[in-house]
A protein has these predicted regions:
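Residues at the C-termini of beta-strands that transition into short coil/loop
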Residues: 13, 51, 76, 103, ...
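Rossmann-like NAD(P)-binding element
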Residues: 11-48
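Rossmann-like NAD(P)(H) cofactor-binding subdomain of soluble oxidoreductases
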Residues: 36-87
Length: 157
């Protein structure tokens, strides 16, 4: 809280007041958080996860959003470094970077504009829309496969 990045705690009193919730924790944790707290989210709120995989998260979070009447969109900012943790954060991390969206429906142009407007302060360069399955397939080849291959190469005799 000393850095000013955290303004307070999310709890039973503050969650209902949020218009935008960004779930920036691991996939299982994001889905569990929403399952545990979905009843507190205002029906007008927009909730996005920022996880690197979409199938598990969307499969669990879309039904929670439907049950409680708020909007959930899967999201994956395509930016970052090999470092993790708050001490490696940068204000310009997303400037010009692409953002992948997995909406509950592909024909809701107003929702896509709402997400784009909500994320505007981050400075994303472009938004693309896909399914959870297609997202995870693309990420497996473009992000995870190079890690697997380089690891195998390093460990080979």
């Amino acid at each position: 809280m000393l850095s000013g990045a955290v303004h307070g705690r999310l709890d039973e009193e503050t969650i209902p007041a949020c218009e935008l919730l960004l779930l920036a924790i691991y996939p299982g944790g994001s889905a569990k958080w929403l399952e545990d707290n979905g009843r507190l989210v205002d029906s007008g709120a927009l909730v996005l996860d920022l996880c690197g995989i979409k199938q598990e998260v969307c499969k669990r979070c879309f039904p929670v959003a439907r049950k409680y009447g708020f909007t959930f969109v899967g999201g994956h900012p395509m930016a970052g470094t090999h470092f993790s943790g708050f001490k490696y954060s940068r204000a310009d991390l997303y400037k010009g970077a692409p953002m992948v969206l997995v909406p509950p429906r592909f024909d809701d142009i107003d929702l896509l504009q709402r997400v784009k407007d909500a994320m505007a302060p981050c400075g994303f360069g472009m938004f693309s829309v896909t399914t959870a399955e297609e997202h995870d397939r693309m990420i497996a080849f473009t992000s995870q496969m190079p890690h697997v291959l380089s690891n195998a190469f390093i460990k080979s005799p």
